Design a protein with these regions (language model features):
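Polar/charged alpha-helical tracts
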Residues: 1-2, 20, 45, 81-82
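Mixed-charge, Lys/Arg-rich low-complexity intrinsically disordered regions
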Residues: 1-19
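Conserved beta-strand residues within beta-sheet cores
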Residues: 12, 38-40, 81
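Short stretches within intrinsically disordered, low-complexity N-terminal or propeptide regions
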Residues: 16, 55, 85-88
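Short coil-to-beta transition motif at edge beta-strands of beta-rich domains
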Residues: 16-30
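Acidic, low-complexity, intrinsically disordered interaction modules
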Residues: 27-76
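Mixed-charge, Lys/Arg-enriched low-complexity segments
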Residues: 75-88
Length: 88
């Protein structure tokens, strides 16, 4: 699975999966944070931080283990264990 970030003029990020063509919830860039070597987290509607890239071994316990995406609802929709992240 390949995940692409798209940042628009309103400072929002859309997450899209090129393999399925699905576009996930847009979030404000203030809710997306990077840390460590290879970690990226997104704050979901529930206020939880989840890892989009990296693993718990790289990221420690700052985010939920493994990788998740939000579908814009109050639930974390999809586990993405080996996501490749690219910024466009």
């Amino acid at each position: 699975m390949e995940i692409i970030f798209t940042v628009n003029h309103n400072n929002l990020i859309a997450f899209s999966d090129l393999n399925s063509g699905q576009i996930f919830k847009m979030v404000n860039t203030d809710d997306v944070r990077t840390f460590g070597e290879d970690c990226l987290c997104m704050k979901t509607d529930t206020g939880d931080l989840v890892i989009l890239a990296g693993t718990k071994y790289h990221c420690g316990m700052l985010c939920e283990p493994d990788c998740y995406l939000s579908d814009g609802s109050n639930t974390i929709m999809e586990k993405v264990p080996n996501a490749v992240i690219a910024l466009t």
